[in-house]
């Protein structure tokens, strides 16, 4: 019965999806990440700077959005199981006077079903560092009915969202496997360095049809923007977080490779790719 209800929910949230067309142009190449042979994953943007994360928790690489210049490399503790699949800046500052808001990063791993919150600091001389100030631990995937959790934050509404799959597969749509979106409250960093969620903390669950490989995600204006897929089989999906309905989906026109990170800059969607290309959308997205 539970499976029947889930399938019904999938059908309800996908009826009437607007097919639209969003095109992308390449704006620069992440030379440093590729030279270091880092496996590019989630990314986010703040203060005109792109913060690129990598698999295995390799250093965070910072680029100038104006010209793609490499600015610096932030050393963090390398951890093989940390995938860093999604990253998103909030609009919350740890302390008044901080240059950057808190950065939320999902480890997106069956064993590491958690996210970490970074405080990014910059000195007057321009040196940038990152410190983990909070760890968010989510229920076991089998308990919450969501595998490969990716985090996206809506700080304005006070929520965090996890996206993932109802079965332990990110590339097969069999057995009713579907994309899940779970809503949790967004805890304050003042609540402590470790927050453990349980299944009763799930405030809302939305379901959508299966799409291969959840990739970068971010929230703007009450809508979740997320890229899916790999080379030749990728798309951008916009979901209304008040209803769970998909507003539109589009092929990633102009992006031949695998999308990884997603952020916003000057009201445009920015997508970073596994091979180092950085793309900008022709779609204008207003909001915070």
Cite the ranges covered by each PLM segment.
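A short helix->beta-strand "capping" segment at the edge of beta-propeller domains
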Residues: 19-37, 197-202
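Beta-strand-rich domains and repeat architectures in extracellular enzymes and scaffolds
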Residues: 28-58
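Surface loop/turn motifs at the tips and blade-to-blade linkers of beta-strand repeat domains
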Residues: 30-36, 75-80, 137-144, 204-210, ...
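Structural signature of eukaryotic scaffold interfaces centered on beta-propeller domains
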Residues: 39-46, 83-100, 145-158, 166, ...
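Structural motif
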Residues: 57-62, 110-121, 168-185, 232-238, ...
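Blade-loop segments of beta-propeller domains
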Residues: 68-108
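Loop/turn-rich, solvent-exposed surfaces of beta-rich toroidal or solenoidal domains
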Residues: 199-241
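Conserved blade-ending motifs and adjacent loop-strand segments that build the rim/top face
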Residues: 245-265
């Amino acid at each position: 019965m539970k499976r029947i209800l889930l399938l019904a929910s999938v059908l309800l949230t996908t009826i009437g999806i607007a097919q639209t067309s969003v095109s992308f142009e390449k704006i620069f190449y992440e030379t440093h990440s590729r030279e270091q042979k880092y496996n590019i994953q989630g990314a986010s943007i703040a203060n005109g700077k792109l913060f690129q994360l990598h698999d295995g928790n390799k250093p965070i690489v910072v680029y100038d959005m104006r010209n793609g210049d490499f600015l610096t490399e932030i050393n963090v503790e390398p951890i093989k199981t940390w995938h860093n699949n999604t990253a998103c800046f909030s609009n919350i500052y740890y302390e008044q006077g901080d240059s950057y808001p808190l950065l939320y990063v999902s480890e997106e791993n069956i064993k590491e079903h958690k996210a970490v919150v970074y405080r990014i600091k910059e000195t007057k001389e321009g040196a940038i560092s990152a410190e983990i100030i909070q760890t968010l631990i989510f229920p076991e995937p089998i308990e919450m009915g969501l595998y490969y959790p990716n985090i996206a934050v809506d700080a304005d509404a006070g929520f965090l969202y996890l996206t993932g799959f109802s079965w332990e597969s990110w590339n097969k749509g069999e057995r009713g496997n579907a994309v899940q979106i779970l809503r949790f409250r967004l805890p304050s960093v003042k609540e402590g360095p470790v927050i453990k969620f349980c299944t009763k903390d799930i405030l809302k669950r939305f379901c959508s049809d299966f799409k291969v490989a959840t990739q970068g995600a971010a929230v703007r204006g009450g809508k979740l923007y997320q890229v899916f897929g790999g080379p030749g089989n990728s798309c951008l999906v916009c979901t209304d977080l008040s209803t769970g309905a998909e507003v539109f989906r589009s092929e990633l026109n102009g992006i031949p490779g695998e999308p990884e990170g997603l952020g916003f800059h000057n009201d445009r969607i920015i997508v970073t790719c596994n091979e180092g290309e950085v793309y900008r959308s022709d779609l204008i997205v207003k909001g915070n």
